[in-house]
């Protein structure tokens, strides 16, 4: 059950996209900008370009297309062009990419601006390693492509008021953080102690970097960590963490699935949060972790590169590694552990982390600036 993954997805989203534009005429509203997101809404700028740009009620609207994850492009056989999408054959070249219909590619072609969910990701998707085949479509559209980092809801994720964590705390009164750690260990069945607690809340899939985690997991335990994992996904990773829980019953806790309240307790109760992603368009977990004074250990990719400053810098908020390599990740984990035992430096780091601002305010300013530029309102 859900919004995606049905045999008739193309028809569903074609209908929705056409309905959006028809609805504007019915309610007699002409926006200056339409900002469509991902392949599910990619037909909105396409339909506008083909059918509505000369409509007396809708002419002059500018279209922004936002890519959240370029892996999901809306690819279908060419046979749906006319019957399902309702697009005349002479527009086939607009819709076609590598002998298929590609809805995301078509939106990239016709949109006035293309945005992504982080500045680094907007550059990475020009590289075949990240683009899932769309680098050719994007290479000559760089002039209209940019990236704005997403934000988080700082009211929902607020350690000072969050009712789902065992104790509240602030940047100036951190005592509740330790209570959260103690209660987390109690809830997941691990013994109390001063050892650093490493948290992970994630889908257990290859592109989240879990092959790196598998490679050096024993080494992480040997560094003295307790590890708390919440997630589900590929069977190989679920099985691995079940085995690690059995192998290290006093060091490893694994909950298969997703429990929102437990996720919050991990964000609040862990000392470090590991995100070794192979690719990460934006990522929100690292921002949430910072909010709760939990130090991110991340691979420097996509939004992780834009949001976490390595502690080699005096303004550092976490630990980063560049190469997609298990031992580079392990070294970052070791650096975090070494800092953890230097309580003066660790407290300074936690303070910097909790003061980092990843609200929507900055992102909103950037989008408003883009919209004003397109609307001619400098």
Short names for language-model regions:
Residues 1-378:
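Catalytic cores of nucleotide-sugar-dependent glycosyltransferases that transfer UDP/GDP/TDP-activated
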């Amino acid at each position: 059950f859900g919004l995606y993954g049905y045999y008739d997805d193309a028809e569903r989203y074609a209908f929705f996209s056409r309905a959006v534009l028809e609805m504007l005429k019915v309610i007699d509203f002409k926006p200056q900008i339409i900002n469509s997101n991902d392949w599910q809404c990619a037909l909105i700028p396409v339909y506008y370009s083909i059918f509505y740009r000369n409509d007396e009620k809708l002419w002059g609207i500018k279209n922004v297309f936002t890519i959240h994850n370029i892996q999901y492009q809306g690819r279908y056989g060419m046979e749906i062009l006319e019957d399902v999408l309702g697009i005349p054959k002479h527009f086939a070249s607009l819709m076609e990419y590598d002998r298929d219909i590609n809805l995301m590619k078509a939106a990239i072609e016709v949109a006035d601006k293309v945005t992504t969910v982080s500045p680094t990701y907007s550059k990475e998707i020009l590289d075949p390693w990240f683009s899932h085949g769309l680098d050719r479509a994007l290479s000559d559209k760089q002039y209209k492509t940019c990236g704005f980092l997403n934000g988080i809801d700082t009211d929902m994720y607020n350690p000072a008021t969050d009712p789902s964590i065992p104790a509240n705390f602030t940047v100036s009164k951190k005592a509740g953080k330790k209570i959260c750690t103690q209660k987390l260990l109690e809830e997941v069945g691990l013994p109390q102690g001063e050892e650093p607690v490493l948290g992970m809340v994630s889908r257990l899939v290859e592109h989240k970097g879990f092959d790196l985690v598998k490679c050096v997991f024993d080494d992480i335990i040997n560094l003295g960590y307790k590890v708390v994992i919440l997630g589900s996904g590929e069977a190989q990773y679920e099985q691995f963490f079940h085995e690690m829980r059995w192998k290290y019953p006093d060091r490893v806790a694994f909950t298969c699935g997703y429990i929102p309240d437990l996720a919050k307790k991990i964000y609040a109760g862990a000392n470090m949060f590991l995100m070794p992603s192979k690719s990460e368009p934006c990522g929100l977990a690292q921002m949430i972790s910072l909010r709760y004074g939990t130090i991110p250990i991340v691979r420097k990719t996509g939004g992780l590169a834009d949001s976490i400053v390595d502690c080699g810098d005096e303004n550092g908020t976490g630990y980063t590694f560049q190469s997609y390599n298990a031992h580079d990740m392990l070294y970052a984990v070791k650096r975090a552990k070494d800092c953890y035992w230097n309580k003066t430096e660790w407290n300074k780091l936690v303070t910097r982390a909790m003061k980092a601002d990843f609200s929507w305010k900055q992102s909103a300013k950037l989008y408003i600036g883009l919209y004003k530029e397109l609307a001619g309102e400098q």
